[in-house]
Amino acid sequence: MAEPGRYHHLTVIEEQPHGLYLDDAEGGKVLLPRKQIPANSAIGDVLKVFVYLDSDDRPIATTLRPKAQLHQVAWLNVVDVNQTGAFLDWGLAKDSFVPFSVQKQRLEPGKSCAVYLYLDNTGRIVASTKLNRFIKDEVASIWPGEPLPLKNGDAVKLFIAQRTELGYKAVVNNEYWGILYNTDIRSAIRVGQKLDGFIKRVREDKRLDLMLEPAGHEKADPLAKRIL
């Protein structure tokens, strides 16, 4: 089965009144509802779709773009709360679910929160506000003796997660925590924002200091102005 919570390139193998069936590459098929079908699609075409579970927990495909996919952090709005948990708008027909057991604090309709999307032990896509369960404090090699996956100056993707006295805690590449210090911030940013950034320093304790501009940017700008 095509893994739920991710984008896949799947081949159209059958057409029915209610939509197209796509080959899930493992001997099964997944439905793309008719209202989601791109114009002029035909059997044999390969379509880029996002696969998730419908209200009956059956795999279903969509051409809509969710606000996040599996193993990513996102800033989502709470649309409802019931006796089992909270529901978040992630851009698809079926809302993302946050069980009470993985809520750092109780969520309320109309509020927004940072969440991490993962598969629970039943195979459902769920969200958690307990980011520390998934985001690592320290970078580490995949295998002993190998270089660290990040080094000083590397370009990275940042998710601004929390304001602190020092600046902002940010999630780096959906995997590690890092600190963006006040002294390295030159324009307004906000919690929930996604930004391009850089590794300022991999510290001796394997934690990450971050910056929003490449190293040497401050020195280069005045020189560039003089040349112009």
Where in this protein do the model-derived segments appear?
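Single-stranded RNA-binding regions, centering on S1/OB-family and related RNA-binding modules
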Residues: 1-228
